[in-house]
């Protein structure tokens, strides 16, 4: 039949070649049907309006013309609208700020063109407090107190300089003594060095350091551009002026897509210790180290440009420095506005009020850096045109660099190489490689805005004037930006203010919650392995190379991959503080999970940190100052004429009626923490000589703490504490097995056997080998054959206690090896129990049962075991369960004469009844096989 079909099509082809071919457009198409979906890729079809006429039949139209066509439509993703939760209740009225707040969260960011959220997330209102404010004024001791509450050195009074910031140190001065012999100007733009920096948004924020404060020291620095020195502020360790304009420091970088440009795993260290989140922000490199830019502007613009077509990017950048600076490591002078904001923070933790610090002043401050400017452009090229140009990535970078030196820097002796003007891309644009770009995104920083704007490249523009770059460079000296900087957390600045320790702890807690709002774990997965990034309350998709479209849903012809890389879901809430003073949180690689060979998520699944819990009544946050950050037991001991100081409780114990001094004859009671119990006499008595009469007492653990295991493992039963003797079972997802023991028992104060932290799941190769075969067998084609212990049992399998009737000995064997040897007709091996062999009743009965089994007429396979006449196989547990004697069959050939308990009378029982009685551990003596003679 197939041969006839081939001959038919050969004949048809010959006829068509002679001119007898159907002109299919003679039969028009219908209109396309409406799309089957409004979004998320639907289909639509159309049909050819066929009329079976003479022309149709004579010209083979039936065989030549397609009758139906289908095409994809509405391939854009369905929009996801931003969704806000309801406001929670009003917080308690804070007595220090006389405000209360209520907050709501973003339940779902907008994505794929959905409606954004524009309503506020926090609401405040004034209130009348019912409690007193516990914040006390800072103790200035021997320093001068400003009207603002700030403490400054006494030597700064009446020196003619506004050191307090409110001029209160210069009030009522009879005579002033100047610090410097003449007046010096401040360093230009010195206030920029004291700005806060929002690491998560990549932009400077409000002033946190007062760099107008000189600290009563006349330290100056001189610039080569001016004859007059500048006054150095007290917050700066050193300052050095320089101007760098070398032509050879013009650098270029090539990016196949924006994922590598906006994501750098190695650049998250500045805040990873505060939350360990997986998110990152767009990072751009300068000459010294990586820096962030505002991902709500330039990076967002780059993402939107990449959606138009499959794109590659070439970035060219040059750093010009005016000066370098280093901030002092300690004793920094805060700005008045930042100090006022810190002083107005409540003592009780309030997420909304504490988070405003990061909104207003950023998350970090500059510890070192440079002032200057950065010439920085990101050129977008069509990936297809770059590929067709015939240039390599390195050659394309070189052409952009050479052309920039000639057209922007107007560098003399710059020779444009032949390959940069004669490739297929440059030839379309009169020899210009840069003109072949789709557009450019300006990342220029520093200098006057009109000069910076003039440096930006636009497609089809006539080019720059020769003075444009030099004018911008000159303006950088007067209008610099902070570049090439190092950062430290802004929380470190919260010192020497009232309740500094309490407020630092609250700010650290607020930062964890605040940083989570920037985590793209809240976004839905992007098509074609795109990487989601969160911009405010909107999720954007950063496309992989070879993909494009508003949400990366379109593919270039050569993009064939179907792999889906895994991305982290959001962190769970922190667990409660357990008896080991630890708490933990977890996350899953399921947004999405890796599929079809995609990469697994990088980073940790579980985080653990120290924590504390109180056994006393919670009376609110205490006001702890920097000089009070010590425990009560560190305070000086109270001297008294009589009585006893507080005794030392045993480890994991505490004193019920705790105080510093006890009267003679007074008793104290020792209690133990949860999970421990007192062993011994738990009362101490104060003696007249100031010592304690006490017996031996200790706190012994009565429970085991839930073990820490890999997230892929499931603990059953799942609870925080387990009593002595309780067991847990570790299981894995379907298709995987525990790579070690799966059952553990709480014994004493630890788990037996010990649970390894590295214990995880592995692919269940035994199931794959086994196929549809019985235990101990493997699939070989369509047949089942016995496994070979040496070849097929190299992986982990649980331990079994096994009895060998040949050697009359028992030993521990891996389950796989035991089943394989049983399959190979090794009948002398008998299963005793799961787990390693241990002396006891279970082992005694197992040995007796194995010896007695040779006389059984029934041998039913059941899991690892074989059930005999006195047993049945449990379908739910795959274990042999002993029958009760009345459940045994009557009669039979296997009979025994026995004597029960202390009775002297003899009785004839069959093998089932004898086995059932011995299994129940009842006393019985077997006199001889066969019926009793009497």
Curated annotation (Swiss-Prot):
Keyword Signal part of the UniProt annotation: yes
- Identify the residues that the record assigns to the MACPF domain, covering every copy: 176-522
Q: Which residues form the signal peptide?
A: 1-21
Where is it localised?
Answer: Secreted; Target cell membrane
Q: How does it sit in the membrane?
A: Multi-pass membrane protein
Q: How is its activity regulated?
A: Membrane attack complex (MAC) assembly is inhibited by CD59, thereby protecting self-cells from damage during complement activation. MAC assembly is also inhibited by clusterin (CLU) chaperones that inhibit polymerization of C9.
CCP 2: annotated segments: 689-765
Which intervals hold domain EGF-like?
Answer: 523-553
Domain (Kazal-like) ranges: 780-839, 876-934
Q: What range(s) does the Sushi domain occupy?
A: 642-701, 702-763
In terms of PANTHER family, this protein maps to: COMPLEMENT COMPONENT C6
Instruction: Spell out the protein name for this chain.
Output: Complement component C6
Q: Which organism is it from?
A: Pongo pygmaeus (Bornean orangutan)
